[in-house]
């Protein structure tokens, strides 16, 4: 993930410009309540943290995980500047997620925002996240699906080379297979789809 250490400054600016609306919609679908504990994997530069923190409040908790020190440094600056003492930043390989690693017995909700198209062994990562969510908790996945047939060549090149993402992955499928009360929001994206899928763990 050294690529993302260098990429962090541009990622934060570009991603928020392009996907700020999608982020807000995905977090809305989590139906977070004050006092909840929410997991953010991968957190990247922490762009979701202010929104998540505003929903769970001072009595809740945000656990944000990323493998890139450069990304986490930017996330940490947000947390320190805001003075939040209920946001935990964890530098870790998401394939090794566990209750001990994140320091919680379980979480009430989890979000995977623009990450499952990037991380290795993405199905394993998703399952680790899903397993940490308590029954009745909500999970949201937001990512891009660009199959390369109808999508813009510029978009495909950007995500493959700059973001190092494989946007042909159908990253919502493991959630759809295991969750109930599914909600899906699609936005056209250069001929592809910016897709948000959320569901409740049985």
Where are these regions (language model features)?
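A short glycine-rich, Lys/Arg-flanked "PGG" loop and its adjoining helix->strand segment in the class I
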Residues: 123-135
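C-terminal lobe and adjacent flexible extensions of AdoMet/dcAdoMet transferase-like proteins
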Residues: 197-202
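Helix-to-beta-strand junctions that scaffold the AdoMet/dcAdoMet cofactor pocket
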Residues: 57, 119-120, 133-134
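A short acidic, Gly/Pro-enriched loop at the edge of an enzyme's catalytic core
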Residues: 95-110
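C-terminal alpha-helical "lid/dimerization" subdomain adjacent to the S-adenosyl-L-methionine
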Residues: 14-15, 140-195
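Conserved class I S-adenosyl-L-methionine
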Residues: 1-31, 47-51, 74, 150-159
């Amino acid at each position: 993930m050294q690529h993302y250490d260098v990429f962090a400054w541009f990622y934060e600016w570009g991603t928020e410009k392009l996907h700020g609306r999608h982020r807000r919609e995905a977090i809305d679908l989590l139906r977070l309540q004050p006092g909840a504990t929410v997991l953010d994997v991968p957190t990247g530069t922490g762009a979701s943290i202010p929104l998540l923190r505003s929903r769970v409040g001072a009595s809740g908790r945000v656990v944000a995980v990323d493998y890139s020190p450069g990304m986490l440094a930017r996330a940490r600056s947000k947390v320190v500047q805001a003075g939040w003492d209920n946001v935990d930043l964890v530098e870790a390989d998401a394939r090794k997620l566990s209750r001990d690693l994140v320091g919680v017995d379980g979480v009430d909700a989890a979000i995977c925002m623009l990450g499952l198209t990037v991380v290795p062994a993405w199905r394993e990562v998703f399952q680790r996240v899903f397993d940490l969510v308590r029954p009745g908790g909500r999970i949201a996945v937001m990512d891009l699906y660009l199959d390369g047939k109808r999508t813009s060549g510029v978009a495909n090149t950007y995500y493959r080379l700059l973001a190092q993402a494989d946007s042909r992955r159908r990253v919502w499928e493991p959630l759809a297979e295991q969750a109930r009360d599914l909600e899906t929001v699609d936005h056209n994206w250069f001929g592809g789809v910016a897709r948000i899928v959320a569901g409740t763990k049985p």
